[in-house]
């Protein structure tokens, strides 16, 4: 309630303002630049959306484009240091002053002083650098200026990860890589990638060549990511995966910043090198043993087998909040043959060939204060195996950081098992996770 004293004071103020705005006090000459006019524009505003390689407007089917969530966008007066051409440790640092991370729909907005700058857009080892002149007002960047590159061309400011792919027999991950522009691979063919890989991709096979890769740490160091998709037989490298010298190479590669992508029946590669983080649930024995995250030595008391039975998970769910928000904004082909908006809380995950009974935190060492540091595996997608006791809402896609700066991604499902146009939800999730496993590492233990 207002008092009468307050009313008198209010009227007095109104009277004083009326006098101040009269003809004797020219507070507004009618130009609109006075206290009631719009504030002057003093900054340059930069807007846009970051897109996945080869999946921007004009590249993907209308409405089925793939944005990049969590990409770093910033400006600098100097060109950034080049991304190393091989494996390296990228520890997390604060976001550059004035930099932003893109939203779930890939959008960003920067407000800076007008001038000429380097504009850097980066997600993991995907990076585009370009000079840009910014003047007062808003500049909206077109997709061709904000789409992550699918080639390694540092002299032109274009970077993408160097990858090795061990060619699977049932999971043609190279088709997904082809759809995001790796090499000249025909993304819809589900055919042999030989001759299509390009300089950014090196192909191996499980029969004999993969063994030489795993036995040569210097060859492994050439690649930021090594893909080990499902193979019906691991006999070509089974002996090597029981050899602690080879397993030490895998541990050393990850420790130095390397990323491993492993799916279903190829799980022995990760399970034998790092036995503790994931316990597989199907009939094959789970690996048991030890490993030292700093010396890379280890033991295997039980040599595991990741082979399991086929099932479809009708209740797939993106359990990471950022992944959930990102997937929920997208539209694309469905497993039933239609096209529609994805529900990140209920989608079908097909061609699972094992299930994860549980994940375990693993102590890696201590920090500078002497406190223990644990590797806590992270589930990105969950789902159920029908008819299997205890296999409800279990992790289907997991990442963990078992040593140093690197990461391991394991999925129970195959990603590409038949030719088709476009990208299904689990294939889009793969693209998201390829981006995520390249990001920096917090508090690595060496």
What are these regions (language model features)?
Residues 15-54, 129, 141, 145, ...:
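Bacterial Sec-dependent N-terminal signal peptides
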Residues 30-31, 171, 271-272, 278-290, ...:
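Extracellular ligand-binding/catalytic regions of CAZymes and related secreted enzymes
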Residues 49-68:
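Structural motif
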Residues 77-107, 111:
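Short, acidic Ser/Thr/Gly-rich low-complexity loop/linker segments typical of extracellular
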Residues 109-142, 147:
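A short, solvent-exposed loop/turn motif at the edges and junctions
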Residues 164-278:
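Helical hinge/lid and interdomain linker segments adjacent to catalytic or ligand-binding clefts
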Residues 233-352:
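A glycine-rich, often tryptophan-bearing local segment used as a flexible ligand/cofactor-contacting loop or short
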Residues 302-419:
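Catalytic beta-strand/loop cores that center a nucleophilic Ser/Cys/Thr
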């Amino acid at each position: 309630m207002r008092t009468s004293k307050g009313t008198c004071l209010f009227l007095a103020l109104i009277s004083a303002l009326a006098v101040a705005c009269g003809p004797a006090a020219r507070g507004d000459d009618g130009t609109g630049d006075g206290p009631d006019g719009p504030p002057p524009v003093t900054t340059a505003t930069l807007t846009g959306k970051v897109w996945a390689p080869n999946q921007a407007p004009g590249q993907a089917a209308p409405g089925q484009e793939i944005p990049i969530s969590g990409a770093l966008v910033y400006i600098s007066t100097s060109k950034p240091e080049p991304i190393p051409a091989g494996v390296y440790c990228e520890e997390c640092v604060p976001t550059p002053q004035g930099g932003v991370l893109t939203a779930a729909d890939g959008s960003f907005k920067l407000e800076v002083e007008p001038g000429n700058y380097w504009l850097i857009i980066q997600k993991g080892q995907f990076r585009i650098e370009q000079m840009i002149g910014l003047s007062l007002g808003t500049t909206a960047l077109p997709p061709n200026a904000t789409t992550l590159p699918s080639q390694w061309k540092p002299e032109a400011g274009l970077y993408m990860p160097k990858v090795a792919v061990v060619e699977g027999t049932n999971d043609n991950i190279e088709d997904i890589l082809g759809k995001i522009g790796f090499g000249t691979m025909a993304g819809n063919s589900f055919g042999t990638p030989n001759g299509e890989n390009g300089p950014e991709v090196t192909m191996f096979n499980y029969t004999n060549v993969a063994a030489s890769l795993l036995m040569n740490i210097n060859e492994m160091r050439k690649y930021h990511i090594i893909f080990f998709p499902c193979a019906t037989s691991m006999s070509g490298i089974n002996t090597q995966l029981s050899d602690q010298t080879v397993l030490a190479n895998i541990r050393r590669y990850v420790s130095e910043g390397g990323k491993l992508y492993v799916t279903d029946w190829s799980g022995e590669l990760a399970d034998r090198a790092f036995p503790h983080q994931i316990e597989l649930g199907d009939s094959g024995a789970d690996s048991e043993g030890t490993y030292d995250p700093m010396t890379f030595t280890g033991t295997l008391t039980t040599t595991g087998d990741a082979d399991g039975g086929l099932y479809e998970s009708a209740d797939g769910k993106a359990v990471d909040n950022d992944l959930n928000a990102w997937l929920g904004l997208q539209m694309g082909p469905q497993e039933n043959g239609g096209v529609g908006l994805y529900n990140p809380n209920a989608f079908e995950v097909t061609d699972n060939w094992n299930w994860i009974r549980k994940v375990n935190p693993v102590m890696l060492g201590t920090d500078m204060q002497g406190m223990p540091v644990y590797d806590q595996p992270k589930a990105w997608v969950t789902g159920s195996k029908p008819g299997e006791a205890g296999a409800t809402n279990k992790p289907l896609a997991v990442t963990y950081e078992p040593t140093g700066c690197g990461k391991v991604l394991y999925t129970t499902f195959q990603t590409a098992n038949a030719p088709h146009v476009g990208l299904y939800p689990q294939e889009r999730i793969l693209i998201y996770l390829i981006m995520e496993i390249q990001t920096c590492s917090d508090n690595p233990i060496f």
